Amino acid sequence: MLLIVGLGNPGIEYEKTRHNIGWWVLDLLRTKLTGLNLRLLCYSRVYELKHELKKEVDFIVYPLTYMNNSGKAVKCLYEPRMDLVVIHDDLDLTVGKTRVRFGGSSAGHKGVSSIIDALGTDSFWRVKVGIGRPFSKQEVINYVLGEPQKNEKEVLIRAADYIADQLCLLITDRNFSRFQQNINSFNSNENN
């Protein structure tokens, strides 16, 4: 079973912000899938995707706890037999750069920190989407909670759409090695 979690903040005022890139990916993913059932549980909007042949269910999750408390929602849904995939923004990657990694520190991302703390482990997949850095450290909060410029937004949408396509493949074949390789080699500034 896959537990695919997009990190973001609920509310219309946040939906187009850089910090909500995890939700952008899930929004695009949902347009590519059929047979999703929506449920509200565990402080989240949860879309279930049932696989009749495999007798499995995958979950696409939008935590409604706000970014810094994402661990509360994930802990409520997570079971050890699940493969957890968390999609989030990354200030240390250039705009549109994508990276997949298994385990490791939160690198200062409070949503990821919350999940690590709640689960008591860092053993899960992270899909990072670069949003770049502001010019000044004092601007970080306003930057992540701000909307990207038009050219930035186009690059981020290309990256989010590519990740959504790769998640569709992962849902089908569970090939994490290929998933990681494809996303790590993607360049959102080129036509792939």
UniProtKB/Swiss-Prot annotation:
Q: Where is this site: Stabilizes the basic form of H active site to accept a proton?
A: 89
Active-site residues per Swiss-Prot or TrEMBL entry: 19
Catalysed reaction(s)? an N-acyl-L-alpha-aminoacyl-tRNA + H2O = an N-acyl-L-amino acid + a tRNA + H(+)
Which HAMAP family does the UniProt record give? Pept_tRNA_hydro_bact
Which top EC class applies here? hydrolase
Q: Which residues of the sequence carry a binding annotation for tRNA?
A: 14, 66, 68
Which controlled-vocabulary keywords does the entry list?
Cytoplasm, Hydrolase, RNA-binding, tRNA-binding
Q: Which GO terms describe its biological process?
A: protein quality control for misfolded or incompletely synthesized proteins; rescue of stalled ribosome
Q: Name one GO molecular function term.
A: peptidyl-tRNA hydrolase activity
Q: What does this protein do?
A: Hydrolyzes ribosome-free peptidyl-tRNAs (with 1 or more amino acids incorporated), which drop off the ribosome during protein synthesis, or as a result of ribosome stalling. Catalyzes the release of premature peptidyl moieties from peptidyl-tRNA molecules trapped in stalled 50S ribosomal subunits, and thus maintains levels of free tRNAs and 50S ribosomes.
- Quaternary state and partners of this protein? Monomer.
The residues that cross the membrane are: none
The record's listing under Gene3D superfamilies reads: Peptidyl-tRNA hydrolase
Originating gene: pth
Mind telling me which InterPro entries this protein's record contains? Pept_tRNA_hydro (IPR001328), Pept_tRNA_hydro_CS (IPR018171), Pept_tRNA_hydro_sf (IPR036416)
CDD domains assigned: PTH (cd00462)
Name the chain's protein.
Peptidyl-tRNA hydrolase
List residue numbers at the site (Discriminates between blocked and unblocked aminoacyl-tRNA).
9
